[in-house]
């Protein structure tokens, strides 16, 4: 099953995340199928390709709770 979830990168105590599509059995920082966005909790910025998100959800990928919240916030801003 495909999941849309966060992949951590950045420095110590300065997390940033990539929003990725990945097989649910793979590790958090494993190789993604596709990268569809970016999220930085420190300055609360995000950039998401909504077309790709909707395409992947239509194909059966399930977003995690946090990713769903980030997508909702991004849609409200734009």
From Swiss-Prot:
Cross-referenced Pfam families: Ribosomal_S16
**Keyword check for DNA repair:** no
Cellular compartment(s): Plastid, Chloroplast
**Biological process annotations from GO:** mitochondrial translation
| A Gene Ontology term for the protein's cellular component | chloroplast
Tell me which UniProt keywords the record has, alphabetically: Chloroplast, Plastid, Ribonucleoprotein, Ribosomal protein
SUPFAM superfamilies, per database record? Ribosomal protein S16
Whether Phosphoprotein counts among this entry's keywords is no
* Gene3D superfamilies, per database record: 3.30.1320.10
* GO MF, one example: structural constituent of ribosome
- This protein's major location comes to plastid
Q: Which family does it belong to?
A: Belongs to the bacterial ribosomal protein bS16 family.
Q: What is this protein called?
A: Small ribosomal subunit protein bS16c
